[in-house]
Amino acid sequence: MNYRMQIQYDGARYRGWQRQAATGDTIQGKLEAILTRRFGRNIEIDGASRTDAGVHALAQIANFHVADDEAVEPEELQKYINQYLPEDIAVTGVVAAGERFHSRLNATGKTYEYHLIPYGTYDVFVRKYAWQMTEPLDIEAMREAAGHVLGS
């Protein structure tokens, strides 16, 4: 059985998505530990994308396999995982996927958003999720730079 999960997380406290030998403070590491406990054996998750330390995700897609005789209802699995996750990580959906589905290899697109607080303005409610500009943007320089990567 292959499960597809949709996950959202506030990455501020984590060292990124990818499991690291030296720390359990990764999103993948947290999820794999819960699934390993649930199934009583090592479960490895494949994510659609790796995020860096401090980066958040609204709809990260991941998948993992279990033997058919270990399969449980997706809704039951989602509830189980969320019960053990910290409050800054949530599995927002679990479905049974085709055996050949792979979250990274079958991804058809990714969207990255960068939030900026303009120079001279302040917003205490988004400060954790946006970069405070320390000087005005040079729009003309940005247009010129974008011309070098357009279409690549």
Where are the language model's segments positioned?
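Structured-RNA-binding interfaces characteristic of tRNA pseudouridine synthases
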Residues: 1-152
